[in-house]
């Protein structure tokens, strides 16, 4: 029985092979399935590796389209405000039976610098690659940029790809403030999901469940520990982020050295994601998000 689900399995576009070689391998369906079978993974949720849409600061450049094929969902919603994002989300929940999205950190700067067509290319590419394996692969992301043009394009492309509007994915995740790790950030609180600015997103989640959506779960994508600690330090003490990464990394590494042999496999994303997710949930709890 293949009872495991793998999240954020990275893929890249073939024409960016050189640029992404040191980030992640290119995506190939057959080897992925062979590897998944070997380790008991029944379903993989794919995520385009950096550099990608989520690494493009300019909203126009990052604007993306939405495609859906059976259980395949590949979404890049560019949004500028939480309110605008919720409007488009609510529309698609009601119109297309859309029940989920993964919100990624998509307003940070990155090395790619391509236009909105790049996002379309990414979605089109992965949709074609996994079209014949809807029971084994899914792909989706939700970008936080300007929605005006993207909303209309997304809906049109979704209908083009999947006339029935049938999309099967669980309700996605909300990644916090590392979307804007830039020197000009002065108020980290406005970018965290326990802030009241995010309430309209959680309201959309509630409405989706009220529409008899089954398994409308929330998946949290925890921020990296280094970004969390470094940015908190920047806000509190006004230091440049680059100046404090070294000490923070050394501090973290010192504590990792004390991990038991049985826990050494947690070093890296597993440990940092656990830290980020716990901050999300505890922050939402003490700030009354679940109560509201």
Curated annotation (Swiss-Prot):
GO terms for molecular function: o-pyrocatechuate decarboxylase activity. It is an enzyme of class 4 (lyase). InterPro entries: Metal_Hydrolase. The keyword Cell membrane does not apply. Keywords: Decarboxylase, Lyase. GO terms for biological process: benzoate catabolic process via hydroxylation. Pathway: Aromatic compound metabolism; benzoate degradation via hydroxylation. It catalyses: 2,3-dihydroxybenzoate + H(+) = catechol + CO2. The active site is at 263. Its EC number is 4.1.1.46. It comes from the Eukaryota. The keyword Lyase applies. Homotetramer. The MW of the complete protein is about 38 kDa (345 residues). Belongs to the metallo-dependent hydrolases superfamily. This is 2,3-dihydroxybenzoate decarboxylase.
């Amino acid at each position: 029985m293949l009872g495991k689900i793998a999240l954020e399995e990275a893929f890249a576009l073939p024409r960016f092979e050189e640029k992404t070689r040191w980030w992640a391998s290119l995506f190939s369906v057959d080897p992925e399935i062979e590897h998944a079978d070997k380790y008991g993974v029944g379903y993989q949720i794919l995520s385009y590796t950096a550099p990608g849409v989520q690494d493009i600061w300019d909203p126009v450049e990052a604007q993306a389209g939405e495609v859906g094929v059976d259980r395949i969902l590949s979404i890049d919603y560019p949004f500028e405000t939480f309110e605008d994002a919720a409007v488009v989300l609510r529309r698609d929940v009601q119109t297309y039976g859309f029940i989920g999205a993964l919100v990624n950190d998509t307003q940070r700067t990155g090395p790619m610098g391509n236009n909105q067509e790049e996002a379309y290319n990414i979605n089109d590419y992965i949709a074609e690659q996994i079209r014949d394996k809807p029971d084994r692969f899914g792909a989706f992301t939700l970008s936080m940029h300007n929605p005006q043009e993207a909303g209309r394009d997304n809906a049109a492309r979704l209908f083009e790809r999947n006339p029935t509007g049938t999309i099967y994915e669980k309700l996605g995740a909300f990644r916090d403030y590392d979307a804007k790790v830039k020197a000009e950030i002065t108020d980290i609180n406005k970018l965290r999901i326990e802030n009241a600015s995010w309430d309209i997103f959680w309201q959309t989640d509630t409405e989706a469940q009220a529409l008899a959506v089954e398994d409308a779960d929330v998946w949290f994508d925890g921020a990296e520990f280094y970004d969390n600690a470094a940015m908190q330090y920047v806000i509190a003490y006004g230091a440049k982020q680059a100046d404090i990464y070294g000490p923070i990394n050394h501090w973290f590494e010192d504590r990792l050295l004390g991990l038991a042999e049985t826990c050494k496999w947690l070093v890296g994303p597993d440990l940092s994601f656990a830290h980020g997710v716990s901050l999300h949930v505890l922050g939402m709890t003490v700030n009354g998000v679940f109560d509201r």
